[in-house]
Amino acid sequence: MLKRSHRALLFIIFSFIFSSAGAQKFALVDMDYIFKSIPAYERANEQLNQVSKKWQAEVDALQIEAQTLYKNYQNEVVFLSQEQKKARQDAIVGKEQEAAELKKKYFGPQGELFKKRTALMTPIQEEVYTAVKEIAELRGYQLVLDRASDQGIIFGSPKIDISNEVLSKLGYSN
């Protein structure tokens, strides 16, 4: 009798687990594909690349100036008085600090590049995420995975990939 009720209990538990797992609906989306298909996103990326190159050139120029000052100092150190040595060393350190501060200003965690990226990309990303959410709610998906960023996905059926539907909802044809 105990074995029979034990089996029945196990059957009920497994039935519940499998029935609730079967009710889950999943979808995949390829965010890289979506963003590459949106011209505004590509333009924003290009704009960020251009400004990044410009700012990096400014930082590089200051670093080259510091290196030049140092090389000149090394070549002339034997001819300099203590005061001249100190003045040159201070100039070199000052130039290096100026380059480091400029680099931090442009490329630091809260730097100009971060601010510009946020200003350009956030509206586009929010629009895409809103479209994904609307499609998920409409179709009853409990989970939408990004196949571009989740390396845990080994295989995903194209039938559950909603990337093209997201692009269509945003007004872009694929």
Task: Report residues per predicted region.
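Short, exposed beta-strand-loop hairpins at the edges of beta-sheets
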Residues: 154-155
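Bacterial N-terminal signal peptides
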Residues: 8-19
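Amphipathic alpha-helical segments
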Residues: 24-139, 143-151, 173-174
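Positively charged n-region of N-terminal signal peptides that target proteins for export
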Residues: 1-8
